[in-house]
């Protein structure tokens, strides 16, 4: 990219980053003005990268970031919902960021969604779902669970905060924890049995017999499976 040896290239790179070509926060980092960084001006993906590295810790920014993210109702994020849960979260502020970014995704969806349709996610929890999902760094089950959590926040009425699980049997679950990260990490399934998707229809028939009105039912089911039927 730059002429000269490695040291010269790095110096040229730093000059580029400290110029008007880079984002403001990148310029501040290059100038070592870490305390002047405005986290609100950093894109969601970049913020995730910074908080999942040792950058905040190494530059004494952990408390500042924790105060910032606590003060936010939501946070920006433009990635896929499952990507939010793909990294370990050893720090409280990492979980707080994911919670706020998840809320941001939900708020965006509610602003643009078709109110005449709502979907409940049905998660395959048969044994094969523990395998790595192609194109990601997490399992098929974790991708499905993240999608189930996302769509459950868009449901209303009797099915609000719920999702379906199927293997040899079908169950309906209600998330029991408060925050998105608590819900995601505290819920686990037993990876057993086969894939009995027909059981989903039987479950809705049972719910109707228990007094659920068809008008309360979701308008559709999103089945998330690795396809090993």
Enumerate the predicted regions with their spans.
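Long lumenal/extracellular ectodomains of secretory and single-pass membrane proteins
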Residues: 1-141, 153-229
